[in-house]
Amino acid sequence: MTQTAGTVLLETQILQNMGRADDAARVMRAGVKVFDTDPILRASLARLYISQDKFDDALEQYAILIAQDAENWEAVYAKALVHLEIEEYGEAESLFQRLIDSGERVDESRYYLATSFERQGQLERAIDNYRLVSIGTNNFLGAQQQATRLSIALGAVDAAHDWLQRVSRGQPRLEVLFINMEAQLLQQAGLPAKAKQLLDRSLNRYPGEVDLLFARVIYFDSIKDLAGSEADLRSIIAIKPDDARALNHLGYMLADQTTRYEEALTLLESAIALNPGDPATTDSLAWAQYKLGRYEDALQNIRRAFAVFPDPEVASHMGEILWMMGRRDEALAVWQRALEGAPDDPLVTEAMQRLQTQASEDESE
């Protein structure tokens, strides 16, 4: 068969699929020597080098592509991303700016130019560039989130809010999305009171807006205000009786933090009927069954949840259920495996310490 750039690419792809990356690179390098001016083949070699963390080799290939065609904007963009990846910020910024000046990949370049500034601690320049990313583009929401987070970190909370309001004016769905995002960022920044004020004001403007109610539930959860969380969750369920997320959240909260276990079970059975197979809801259902003393049912469901989502919280629950069934060696094995993946996880360590302490006290009586 006559060799072409296409056959080189095909052979390389086959070798990669077989896990023979080094052989694929060898074939590709040989092909590039033969088909020196084929941009697709050389760009493929550069991407192969990137997959092998051979960034200098990738940069060399992109440099050749740009030398062959100064307006190969995909090569310019890819080269800029590699420089950013290996923290060669000056080179990356120069190339991103070149793309912007040429009207090519402008919004992506703005986003990554801002990322470069952020990584170097030039936060105000980062904010300015994040805010220049155009609405409706792939990076728009991420850019606004980063700009808002950095503004809050700099203490410019009101300015961040005003910017989001200005950008979303006349677009209620976008405004609600931004309010939710801003509230989360305020909480993460240690400003829960401001988050609560924002949500209260916004719910006065958009009463019954489910996403904002749920955001306020997260606030109430953070300050352990059970009554506040329950009130907003019940408001959500009244508006959307089939909201499995709210049913699960309320059911788990009642099972975990109250003795209203039957009520919790009813809510969780409704949630699982709406969202069968969801591991988080299955875990919650198992927890309510455990609290009601239905250990076998609880174990069956917790195993099902853990098989799909082996999260430390699910592991802590499964261990506790096994422990209370008298299967302590199995419980310890579950906890130990969880701690191997998440050392010192507070949920797992709390369950272990609480139950082991209780067992020691029972034995000493």
Task: Please report, for each region that a protein language model flagged, where it lies by residue.
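Structural marker of alpha-solenoid helical repeat scaffolds
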Residues: 1-2, 34-35, 68-69, 101-103, ...
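Start-of-helix register in tetratricopeptide repeats
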Residues: 6, 40, 74, 108, ...
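Register position in tetratricopeptide repeats
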Residues: 17, 51-52, 85-86, 119, ...
